[in-house]
């Protein structure tokens, strides 16, 4: 029962956050380093979420909130928010590191239930960035039973000169 209440509380907080300009969402950036040179060449954008209770900020683990975003469909607007923040940051970083790349996690739900292509292309166009500056990290588990779909997806990425990698490969 406690687990049920916790999930409902988080879902409610997620709905409110999305409705209120993504208040409580943050994007953290994990550097990607070139091992030979020791220089930063990019970053992975990581979605984080904190809910507010009694005016106190309570961080919520991605292990808890990501499945709830997917379950409710809120992963689509939240993912769009992270994508736009990440591409904006990539634009800023390319002033200092000209070949800087940004990796963005894309949920299986985003791929099959939203127009993620339009979102990606619109975002990189808005900041006048080349497609190869963005790498979509697709969680392998969502595609395990979708081999024909996955091949179409790969072809679409290649046609748009977009990179993708399988995230959490081998974890099922």
Regions found by a protein language model. Give the residues of each.
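Catalytic-site/binding-pocket detector for metal-dependent nucleotidyl cyclases
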Residues: 73-74
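Structural preference for long, well-ordered alpha-helical segments in enzyme cores
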Residues: 64, 68-69, 82-90, 119-120, ...
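Active-site core of bacterial EAL-family cyclic-dinucleotide phosphodiesterase domains
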Residues: 2, 6-68, 105, 166
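Residues at alpha-helix caps and immediate loop-helix transition turns in enzyme cores, especially N-
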Residues: 6, 41, 61, 115-117, ...
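Helix C-cap/alpha-to-beta connector motif
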Residues: 21, 56, 81-106, 122-133, ...
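Structural preference for beta-strand elements that scaffold enzyme active sites
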Residues: 26, 42-44, 99-103, 133-137, ...
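The catalytic core of metal-dependent phosphodiesterases that act on cyclic dinucleotides
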Residues: 122-172
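Sensor-regulatory modules in signal-transduction proteins
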Residues: 32-34, 51, 93, 111-113, ...
